[in-house]
Amino acid sequence: MYKEGVCLYRNPLRTPEDVKDWRMEGGGRLSFENGSLNLSHEDDGAHFVLWCPETFPDGIVVTWNFYPIEQPGLCMLFFAAAGDKGEDLFDSGLNKRTGSYQEYHSGDINALHLSYFRRKYAEERAFRTCNLRKSRGFHLVAMGADPLPSPEDADSPYRMKLIKVKDYVHFSINDLPVLEWRDDGKTYGPVLHGGKIGLRQMAPMKAAYHDLSVHQAVRR
């Protein structure tokens, strides 16, 4: 339905210089190994979000390479994130955020949350799904089967692709469709549009990321 148009942002995520302007909320630890950004934790309770500083418009295709290194844990992408009154996500008038999930789903921001690697708890590892939630609130709006292997069976980075155009969200892994959703703009509040994107992990997860790109979404 949509393809990549003009490139709005590109980041290799391979050196400290690549993320010097990114913002960490919570107890995340950054390292760079094998040409990738590795995210891990400072302690078992150190969940965190690493935010890209750019604010993106609506109508985008987000792609990135992902590789799970150690589980249990969880990996998530926040997108269309902004203050609940339309403020920039980093506005000084918003409440301070420290990585606790409640601050993101029931605080003073709106966002969409794509959990694409859910292996924190035994029940998540026993029946693996990718979940899409909308906030403010903890609204589960779509689910799909998770095709990603556990770290011991992973043999290459996996190409993640998220399409967000107005009320439409589509997510795929290595071109395999995983979930799709249309927001009616009523059930869970108005449709979310532009905003920031961020990488979230729940400890003790360790994962690698590289080659993040954001393109304008163009109808095929």
Spans of features found by a protein language model:
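Extracellular glycan-recognition regions
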Residues: 1-220
